């Protein structure tokens, strides 16, 4: 099935497109129902991982599913589930997101031409939608595999109520046992969802959705005689009422709550350290859509009360005073937008968002948005867009992994709101009745008040580290060219993307005030996604990704000073990890059965040629046997080749 995206809606046609063509502004939409032919790596289809095979989304190191969109940092991309923020969308190791795909209906990635109703992000918005329809009969979709198993249920109750439920549980012990010879890791995760849709007749449609996921990990590091335990979780709920006020006017009101919490306990010798961080959002959003003859208008309001625990450090040592601090804030916005087909060959979508943030300080910013589309013909169109975005909640990363040591900070006098100016210009051309298409989009982003953190978790635990003293506020820019070519018919679906880009940062107190590559900088990024159905029984698919290695700061020398090692560093982020690349393949045999709507056996191999893609680099002093010490660089590998087998059934 193929998806062709209009301005506001996805239209499903008879072709098999996995990824829709870009809409007005170059954004991307995915429909879960069209993903059956996608590679089932690890036995499951993951919509968040799929986004890494779309233009402008950089491939990350192994162990990381962070969204680096157009040179933005991980914390500059916001993920929304039915309108509620999902602050930690990845499980540890980066192999899965926290979302159970059968519970979803689709998503849209906004990276330019961002509607005025969305804010709180300076890079990109990923709006994910759960299933909302009245089911006609009871149904189950399940996947049983070696790494994880999941199931989703839909249950109609009468004609006006449908329940949806989903669950996923992992079997990762055999996988984590392969990660290190010096570390014993016990790791588990789970994802759970529950929702309903009720038809209230003339009063409208009421929907509810709740999501919970958790990660539990324990690591015994033998060489350091230490035990580390981690637990982090998301819990969010949304309640929405959609009402038709008139044949041309609809209103949607949503209440939501979202909580993210992470906890790290580290026991080394006789010292126990406890680190806790989190964020809680409680909000309301109302959007009114007015559909006139030729013009569509959206207006609305958004309010969020937010509580943030930046990072509590508690040590089980004598005379220790625990550091506990919780910050509160309010964020409100008024927004409006208009879609106006000014001429047969000119479409305009313009909007304005007025955002207000208050804690110890008050900030107010108008955020203009405009996109102009020029459809030259049904097969060729151009567009240009400008967005001004603000972000008041800031993520402070402390790890390259999808890990529980990152934390959030509210904007303050020392860390003012992040701002970004975003420009883009693109086109798309289609041929062969839409089966073949190619597109290109150039972008430029200028960022103010971006942050860089000069400490790591062990330094924080050691005590005496003041977060604000280790934070630097500066500016950045990113620019690039995204190109894509795709072909789809009833048997073949192929998408090839290439992005040439740079992302730079500049801080007065770092690198002598000179610009340096951002952590998200990837000069070259290539992705390939292909699927082939030689017969109704078989689906063969493959993905390939290549990206320039991530930047890091090299240790050039170690000195012994007193009772500690002193480091000498090279240029800040002046070195790069080896380039990342891997090929993944998947084969599914679909059985014909009178008892099941769909039943298939899948075999997949992640990283077929066992490429050793490093997560990070460390250094150690070693003896070369001649009574001389030398500095050794070590590349840490999480995993290489991962085979999996699973059975999928739907009835």
Question: Language model features by range: what are they?
Answer:
Residues 1-39, 48, 74, 244, ...:
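Short, acidic, small-residue-rich periplasmic hinge/interaction motif at the N-terminus
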Residues 37-39, 84-111, 187:
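Short acidic/polar hinge/loop motifs at secondary-structure boundaries
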Residues 39-43, 48-85, 105:
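Extracytoplasmic beta-strand/coil segments of soluble accessory domains associated
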Residues 53-54, 98-141, 150-152:
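A beta-strand signature from Gram-negative outer-membrane beta-barrel systems
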Residues 261, 309-314, 360, 378-423, ...:
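Surface-exposed extracellular loop regions of Gram-negative outer-membrane beta-barrel proteins
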Residues 281-287, 323-335, 412, 416, ...:
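Outer membrane beta-barrel strand-and-loop segments of large Gram-negative receptors
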Residues 444-446, 467-556:
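Gram-negative outer-membrane beta-barrel transporters
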Residues 537, 546-563, 580-582, 588-651:
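C-terminal beta-signal and adjacent terminal beta-strands/loops
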